[in-house]
Amino acid sequence: MFRWGIIFLVIALIAAALGFGGLAGTAAGAAKIVFVVGIILFLVSLFMGRKRP
């Protein structure tokens, strides 16, 4: 998940450097969404893994 977030962030940075504002905004938005979903899934797995049998 974090790998995809970093990939979208790099795409956004490259697109912004080349002047593609719309594409950079879209890729940055996708990176934020993927990053937040990754953090939420990490926290859920962290707390679900601590259950005692």
Curated annotation (Swiss-Prot):
It is a multi-pass membrane protein. Its main location: membrane. It is found in: Cell membrane. The keyword Transmembrane applies. One of its GO terms (cellular component) is plasma membrane. The chain crosses the membrane at residues 4-24, 30-48. Keywords: Cell membrane, Membrane, Transmembrane, Transmembrane helix. It comes from the Bacteria. Pfam families: DUF1328. Belongs to the UPF0391 family. HAMAP family: UPF0391 (MF_01361). This is UPF0391 membrane protein YtjA. It comes from Escherichia coli O139:H28 (strain E24377A / ETEC). The lineage of its organism: Bacteria, Pseudomonadati, Pseudomonadota, Gammaproteobacteria, Enterobacterales.
